[in-house]
Design a protein with these regions (language model features):
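Beta1/beta-strand and adjacent pyrophosphate-binding region of the FAD-binding site
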Residues: 1-11
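Glycine-rich flavin
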Residues: 1-2, 19-26, 31-154
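N-terminal Rossmann-fold NAD(P) dinucleotide-binding loop
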Residues: 14
Length: 154
């Protein structure tokens, strides 16, 4: 299939680029190997902020008496905290899915690999390979930490 733009990765950089390009009239495809939104939205930044907000609310409850409010026995419900965190991430991922549909963006599930000039090979979960072509390609695959010699990771 041929597109004006292929975006590899649907994290914060990828999904914004895809949506804007579509709004400007381009035929856009996004290649994503996992959930829409990438690591930040699904497992990193957003769920972490949700967990921190729960901790903040518990902290506020612990100091409520300082503000003239009585709260007895405020305690965390870790299952509910985790469920809320996952719910927030899932809702935001579904929001990206909605925006992609609204903007006619094709989602291709699989691992993208640049193979030739203006071509991306995608391997899906079953191991099937397809080749897609675009005039422009944006690599928005995020990053991973790297172990450096003599510097232990913590």
């Amino acid at each position: 299939m041929k597109y004006d733009l292929i975006v590899v990765g649907s994290g914060p950089g990828g999904y914004v680029a895809a949506i804007r390009a579509s709004q400007l009239g381009m035929n856009v495809a996004v290649i994503e190997r996992a959930e829409l939104g990438g690591i930040c939205l699904n497992w990193g930044c957003i769920p972490t902020k949700s967990l921190l907000k729960s901790a903040q609310v518990l902290e506020y409850a612990g100091h409520a008496a300082d503000y003239g409010v009585k709260i007895e026995h405020a305690e965390p419900d870790f299952d509910a905290i985790i469920a809320r965190s996952r719910g927030v991430a899932d809702k935001m991922s579904k929001g990206i899915q909605y925006l992609f549909k609204k903007n006619n963006i094709t989602v291709i599930e699989g691992h993208g690999k640049l193979t030739a000039d203006k071509k991306v090979e995608v391997t899906d979960a079953a191991g099937e390979k397809t080749v897609h072509e675009a005039q422009h390609i944006v690599l928005a695959t995020g990053a991973r930490s790297r172990q450096l010699p003599n510097i232990p990771q913590d």
